[in-house]
Curated annotation (Swiss-Prot):
<dbReference type="GO" id="GO:0016973">
    <property type="term" value="P:poly(A)+ mRNA export from nucleus"/>
</dbReference>
<dbReference type="GO" id="GO:0043035">
    <property type="term" value="F:chromatin insulator sequence binding"/>
</dbReference>
<dbReference type="InterPro" id="IPR038212">
    <property type="entry name" value="TF_EnY2_sf"/>
</dbReference>
<comment type="function">
    <text>Involved in mRNA export coupled transcription activation by association with both the AMEX and the SAGA complexes. The SAGA complex is a multiprotein complex that activates transcription by remodeling chromatin and mediating histone acetylation and deubiquitination. Within the SAGA complex, participates in a subcomplex that specifically deubiquitinates histone H2B. The SAGA complex is recruited to specific gene promoters by activators, where it is required for transcription. Required for nuclear receptor-mediated transactivation.</text>
</comment>
<keyword id="KW-0804">Transcription</keyword>
<dbReference type="GO" id="GO:0006368">
    <property type="term" value="P:transcription elongation by RNA polymerase II"/>
</dbReference>
<keyword id="KW-0156">Chromatin regulator</keyword>
<dbReference type="GO" id="GO:0015031">
    <property type="term" value="P:protein transport"/>
</dbReference>
<keyword id="KW-0539">Nucleus</keyword>
<dbReference type="GO" id="GO:0001094">
    <property type="term" value="F:TFIID-class transcription factor complex binding"/>
</dbReference>
<comment type="similarity">
    <text>Belongs to the ENY2 family.</text>
</comment>
<keyword id="KW-0010">Activator</keyword>
<dbReference type="GO" id="GO:0003713">
    <property type="term" value="F:transcription coactivator activity"/>
</dbReference>
<dbReference type="GO" id="GO:0000124">
    <property type="term" value="C:SAGA complex"/>
</dbReference>
<dbReference type="GO" id="GO:0070742">
    <property type="term" value="F:C2H2 zinc finger domain binding"/>
</dbReference>
<keyword id="KW-0509">mRNA transport</keyword>
<dbReference type="GO" id="GO:0071819">
    <property type="term" value="C:DUBm complex"/>
</dbReference>
């Protein structure tokens, strides 16, 4: 099992995944990222969606790279710190001797 899949599985089992997701959503809303991305989508749809041939998949493909670059560094750092904390907890739990009672 790879490290990323182990972390993914651990975060799902402990409920940390939803906490990380909630933290991300709240931080992106607080910094105005969601509004920026929504406006970007609206502008793209106005520009390219007049003939109804522009699909959701095309919109996602066009917006995703731009939206990722708009995520503030502070939000990225905060999430990385949270994930590192989780990794540290996993490592500490793995290092603890198991009770054989």
């Amino acid at each position: 099992m790879s490290i990323s899949s182990a972390v993914d599985q651990y975060t799902v089992l402990t409920g940390d995944r939803s906490k990380i997701k909630d933290l991300l959503c709240s931080r992106l809303t607080e910094c105005g990222w969601r509004d920026e991305v929504r406006l970007m989508c609206r502008n793209i749809l106005i520009e390219k969606g007049t003939n109804n041939s522009f699909t959701v998949e095309q919109l996602i493909a066009e917006v995703t790279p731009k939206a990722r670059t708009l995520v503030p560094d502070a939000v990225k750092k905060e999430l990385l710190m949270k994930i590192r904390t989780i990794l540290t907890e996993i490592e500490e739990e793995a290092d603890e001797p198991e009770d054989e009672s």
